[in-house]
């Protein structure tokens, strides 16, 4: 057992295995089995290059042998800092086979985050691309505190070339499926990311259950446009869930319609995952591709129902709304849900074994239909962050529920609607303002492409409300925006005190709106 990892209680782990929720097999073995069953099929496509399952298995096992030869042992941590390229898939597969733990960093992470991840995880190795997106990751490797091995895909210079690491016929270790398979990162906008340990048992279940929810099998062709280090593109069913099924994973780092639409048609893509801003980009492209074969999962940020309807009409695709946290819980709409549920809610929990409660500040259930914090536990929601006892005391209840921090309402039918964040409530003159509620209304204005609302300290009101807007092109007067919000029925105290146009909203490496930066901008503009 890895020191600092919080496992599920033994009685629950036994029950999950007895009922077949957990298979009791490590992910590396499950992927290896899929490679044997589908040896001649195409597994991975990227930039015109195609890799079969047989080649994927051969490369992964040879790399696993090489990693073992470098002294990397079971439960050792390796920070993987690669973009959407085949080497990402091969390396993660190899680490799973070797029993080591990938720590999945995002392409946008830099010295602060990577130094923290290496130190906090106790990483023995750091894997990067030589250059990507105009950035030299080797220079970053020189700046962080030393690790035992730096592995570089491409021109390694003084480091170890990832492609040179290999070992044939190296015995692979036995891997305990209850151990962590990989570390995801928390997606908060304050502080450095926390490490989220996902066990082999629970993550294999996520891949199977999300595929079942979307009614996909071995014919699935999944397009990863989000970084594969994100949970959705990784495993919902994502790249690795598709590989477990025998399907095809198509990798790209572009969201441009003129590049993505031909790729979708050429590779007969059936599923992809996007954030609402990308869906808007596609819907506003002026193209009307026939994507009737495509299911688009939309999540990670609020989705305007009008945008969802328009995207479905313009692109011809099916829309499925998802809510998900890297810590576990997933909710989604169903194909047979009424249109208002699909377009206007975040659906119901994925698993019948998810336990979800909506509670007040004292953790007491709120009346049906009222907003409260969503807390959850179940067979794929973690029991604690890695090496974070103080944070675990704050984020988990004594009986094992994870406190999501999300403010939600639940309908009588069980559908969840995210209305904001517990910490994203502005206290203006004693009145509570949900930033999410105001943002949602602002996005319905025809001249507003995106919006973010923050509160900043004020000596008179306690907090003053700032709304940052990304416009579609036409300028709009502040008074017109406020009048529009009044017309939407918002209470007067919810109308933003200040409206600031921006070319784009700042975002964290996890892709979330960076409200810390926006608050600093608001404070500086108020001086």
From Swiss-Prot:
Question: InterPro entries under this entry?
Answer: AMP-bd_C, AMP-bd_C_sf, AMP-binding_CS, AMP-dep_synth/lig_dom, ANL_N_sf, ATP-dep_AMP-bd_enzyme
Enzyme Commission code(s) on record: 6.3.2.-
Keywords carried by this UniProt record? Antibiotic biosynthesis, ATP-binding, Ligase, Nucleotide-binding
| Signal sequence coordinates | none
Determine if Ligase is one of this entry's keywords: yes
Tell me about pH and activity: Optimum pH is 7.0-9.0.
- Is the keyword Phosphoprotein assigned to this protein? no
Superkingdom of this protein's organism: Bacteria
Q: Which GO terms describe its biological process?
A: antibiotic biosynthetic process
Which annotated residues bind substrate?
230-231, 512
Give one GO term, molecular function aspect: ATP binding
Q: Which sites bind ATP?
A: 187-188, 300-302, 406, 421, 512
Q: Using the UniProt record, name the top-level EC class of this enzyme in a single word.
A: ligase
Q: What role is this protein assigned?
A: Involved in triostin biosynthesis. Activates quinoxaline-2-carboxylic acid (QA) via catalysis of the ATP-pyrophosphate exchange reaction dependent on QA, and the formation of the corresponding adenylate. Also activates structural analogs of QA such as quinoline-2-carboxylic acid and thieno[3,2-b]pyridine-5-carboxylic acid, but not quinoline-3-carboxylic acid, quinoline-4-carboxylic acid, pyridine-2-carboxylic acid or 2-pyrazinecarboxylic acid.
- Give the family, as the similarity comment puts it: Belongs to the ATP-dependent AMP-binding enzyme family.
Which proteins does it associate with, and in what oligomeric form?
Monomer.
The protein in question is named Triostin synthetase I
Organism, scientific name: Streptomyces triostinicus
Give the gene name.
trsA
